[in-house]
A protein has these predicted regions:
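Short, surface-exposed charged micro-motifs
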Residues: 9, 18, 43, 97-99, ...
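Core beta-strand elements of the Rossmann-like FAD/NAD(P) dinucleotide-binding domain
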Residues: 35-46, 50
Length: 212
């Protein structure tokens, strides 16, 4: 909303389909309106690629290959009661279902962490839901007396970490990574950012804008 107040135009439900270049310089981005069905060409002098788990795909559209963003899929479940007044986190090695967050009249338990093949096609396996509910009962006795009202999945845009297995998303670093494609690929006019967490998104935005 702040960006809109300063004149930004926000296009929701628009998917990037191609990135155009004039020589070695980014010149435009083509997006597809997933609701209206039309394609829109956006001329630009610079692109900040903040595409999350799709950032590597967008970079490749500009012939900037090898941006290794690993989608780390996780599910969360909302229960129909607010079972605590503050966040509860189990003091254990990182695991599934080890944090409970109160939110208005409900509470949310999370989260799993598995590598996804495609961030556009995330599943919510029944066995993972069951595992999360069992973990909630271990954290708060009586947890299972509440009813699960909603479950959803998302993908973390993790940067490939050579210190762990390529599929071990739980232990991949959560730090941010900014790539200047002029320095890396000889393509002027695009920066890519990946990694980070929701708690650091404002810092990430500040850093990439400062570099631009």
């Amino acid at each position: 909303r702040s960006a809109q107040a300063y004149g930004a135009q926000v296009l929701t439900y628009h998917r990037v389909t191609s990135v155009e270049r004039e020589g070695e310089r980014i010149s435009a981005v083509i997006v597809h309106d997933e609701r209206g069905g039309e394609d829109i060409r956006i001329e630009c002098g610079f692109v900040l690629n903040c595409g999350g788990p799709w950032a590597g795909q967008i970079a490749a559209m500009a012939d900037c290959h090898g941006v290794d963003v690993v989608p780390g899929a996780g599910i969360m479940i909302a229960m129909n009661h607010r079972l605590s007044q503050s966040v509860i986190n189990r003091c254990v090695w990182p695991a599934d279902g080890d944090i409970l967050v109160p939110d208005h009249t409900v509470c949310i338990i999370g989260t799993t962490d598995l590598k996804a093949d495609d961030p556009d096609r995330l599943s919510i396996p029944a066995d993972q839901v069951q595992q999360m509910l069992d973990s909630g009962e271990a954290m708060i006795p009586g947890f299972r007396k509440s009813r699960a009202v909603h479950a959803w999945a998302g993908a973390r845009p993790l940067v490939k970490d050579s210190r762990v297995s390529a599929t071990d998303t739980r232990h991949m670093a959560r730090g941010m990574s900014i790539i200047d494609h002029n320095t890396r690929d000889g393509i002027y006019g695009m920066l890519t950012i990946a990694g980070g967490k929701l708690t650091t998104y404002r810092l990430m935005a500040e850093r990439i804008v400062d570099i631009m």
